[in-house]
Amino acid sequence: MPIITNYNSFAYHFGIQNWSCTQDERGTMYFGNNNGMLVFDGYEWNKFTLPNKGIIRSLLADGNRIYVGSYTDFGYFARNSKGEMTYHSLWPSQYKSHNDEIWNIIKVNGHIYFQSFCSYFDFDGKRVTPYYNSKQLPFWLYQVKGEVYAQLINGGICRLHQGKYQTIIPAKTFHSDNVMGIYSLAQGKTLLITHKQGLFLMEGTKVTPIHTNIDGELAQSLVNRTALLNSHTLILGTIKNGVLAIDLRTFQKVWHYNKTNGLYNNTVLNLYVDKGRNLWVALDNGISLIHTGLPLSVMNMEGIGMVYGMTINNNHMYIATNQSVWQYDMNAQKLTNVLGCEGQNWYVEYLGNQYFVGNNNCIKTVDGTNSASLISDINGSTDLKEYHLFEQHALIEATYTNFRIFHQNNGKWGTPKTISGFTAPIREFEIDNTGVIWAAHMSKGLYRLTLSKDLSHFTHVQYYPSLNKGPEEMFHVMNINGRVVFSYGGGLYTFDDIHKKIVPYNGCGKLSKTGIIASSFIDKSQFWVLNNDGFWLIQSNEQNGQPQTFISNSIFGQEINSYGNAMYVHGNSTYFFLNDGIGKFEGKTISQKVGLYKLYLKEAITKDKDNTVRYLPITHEQEDVTSMGNVFFKLSYPNFNNEKLKFCYTLKGNGQTLCETSNSPVISYNNLGYGDYTFTATVQNLSGEKLGGQIIYKFSYPTPFYLSIWAWIGYAFLLYVGVYTYIRWHTNKIVRRNQKIAAAKLMAQKMKTLEQERIIAEQQKKLLENELELKGKETASMAFDMLALKNSMGGVKEQLLDGVRRGTISTRDVNKILMQMKDKDTDLFWSTFQNNFDLIHKRFFRNLHEKYPELTTNDMKICALLRLNLNTKDIANFTHLSIRGVESVRYRLRKKLGIPTDKSLTDFLIEFE
């Protein structure tokens, strides 16, 4: 049986039902799904929907287009310049729908035919022509020998010619059953497969039924879809019973997958054979991939348990499991349980014409389907190796407690004997080319055991609890190209016979540090190893090993035995130990053929510092692709067999070259510098062969304008202007500072001068004040002197008048004297008095005259005397007026000055300024 991989809706996160499948020129797979279109390259599922969110019933890949059919719509998906899938409808807007749902799309002679159960539509690349005939409704269209054949509903097989159906085979030929597949065979023969009536062969116009060994099974299963796997293998997908393969040379069933033995669902909705000759099965629930293009198969043996060992001899396969031992007749394909081997069995070996089984109870021999225990009181036989050194031939057995040895006697292996000197449970062991036994403890530790020459006891036992400073782990012991190798802590080690110490072993190349736990010899140039990822076929050389083929653990769909050795090589075949089955590999490689598929760039994305995403154009026609400093590339290369492919990336630009190798088709470059870049990518198999060509993608991270040459020129100019401006500003600042200093000095000098002038002015003011004070005193003195003089003159006058009365002087002389005294006195006094008074009292007379121009000179004199606070009597003496006259003058002044009666005239004049 070919191996199978199932994908359910939880794997691809889309609808359950898948109605159709196709593959484009790049090798990418497409599936018509309830929710839209699924796209798969072996690494990633992508999903696309129609504008109406409809079910996609049919698909056809042609060039760069994926034609799709749905309810009352059909068209195609195509990638735009950025790699994004966009839909283009071809549905003729003038066509009146008959509830058409496009179930089938074929291409014949450059025309694309979209077929529903009512009509078909012919698309010649430019125009769509609909065809509808209510009396002839198509059930299915087929491409046969460059022509279109049609199975009509309730009709026969017709040839479609110029829009008309020409009957080739009437419906009664197939008992009104529908034909589900038509294939052109050699020698002009045509194969027809019906829904329930089986297979038919048409030669010319003659149609004859073909009988197979499963005719009844096909009638019950209901054939729904068919595919031609190769020239001699027909695939039938059924409604009720999964997928069957028929050999067209013998018309016998080759294999059959349904839900009971690995297919995810029994209802097949479509079949497709890809470029790698693998079979894709679109199911009513999920998708199954049957790896018919691989040299891998699996023998499903439900209920046998986990396989621990096997051997093949004379087309009989003996299988040791954790439940029993089984014999499988490879010719009759019959499996039989070997009696007496119930329970755990660690190995089965064919040595010296005898079958040995390492059972949990003891070692046993097998004859046919029966076993017999060897005489032994020791439980558990875990490993058995042939010792053929120093002209001695024996078998050495490891048990739960010690080692035992078998010697031949008359061509038969005799009773085992215990090898003394050692006691411990051993899981597996190997014998090196010096006869030393290297044994792995059942749980932990490694032993180096030296045998005596007669093989009866151990002369030296050395124990290695671990090979590094970490925690103790389990050892595995294996033989790689004649050298005993130990696996411990993820690395490989061997014993250096010259330096007598354990050293790292690098004979498996890069795999030497990947946790290898088992190996199996093929020949001097090749061997198998097993690690956590799966099985590796290694091409060995003198110093190193190069992986040639990888088989993933998961590809068989069943658990593998990771306890110890899990491989057996027989001839050109390698068998792998599984749970409830055995995997089989034929040949020496499963690497893809160079050029089978094409490597292409799926997405190119750039992000700025704010994580804003922008998709870059990826078509070759696009030029001047600009990005930001972070670039993300996603490649696509079909890898449906889970091969270990290497993607090699190179980025050149900005004066550096970045190279990286990865198992992932995704790579990102962050914090790139400005400049032009060239990104190249290739994909390689384990042998280093380049697959799918090379991707070359050029892009640039343009220098922003603020860092361009013109910007730098601008910056230089601005710098020049700035420096010039600064120099000017600084120079002006110095000038202004010097000017300020000079001005300050000048100001200080002026202030000093002003201070001196102020001091002089103050001194002058003091002098003036002193002078004014002196003048005031002088004025007051004059007033009082004048008053005293007046009083004296009054006395003189009285004396003169008295002389007149006595006749001593004439009246005329007296009057003359008195008049002279009066005039002289008045002019001199008032001239001096007015000058001094005006100085002391701040222009009193002028201000009084300006404000009260109606005042007379005498009024002004009276005002001055009042300001000096003289009483009426004194004023009368000054003015030669009587007291009543002075009172009259005071009254007139009060009226002229507008002084109210309640205010003192003297106070008013004292306060006047």
Where are these regions (language model features)?
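Short loop/turn segments that connect beta-strands within beta-propeller blades
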Residues: 41-44, 79-82, 123-127, 160-164, ...
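Conserved beta-propeller blade signature
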Residues: 28-31, 65-68, 111-114, 147-150, ...
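Asp-box/WD-like beta-propeller blade repeats and closely related beta-sheet repeat scaffolds
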Residues: 83-109, 115-119, 127-138, 381-382
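Residue-level "micro-hotspots" composed of small/polar
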Residues: 1-23, 35, 50-56, 76, ...
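Cytosolic signal-transmission helices at domain junctions
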Residues: 297-301, 724-794, 798
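Cytosolic nucleotide-binding catalytic cores of signal-transduction proteins
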Residues: 636-678, 682-702, 794, 800-808, ...
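Residue-level detector of Asp-centered blade-edge/turn motifs that repeat once per structural unit
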Residues: 23-26, 61-63, 107-109, 143-145, ...
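Loop/turn residues immediately N-terminal
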Residues: 34-38, 72-75, 117-121, 153-157, ...
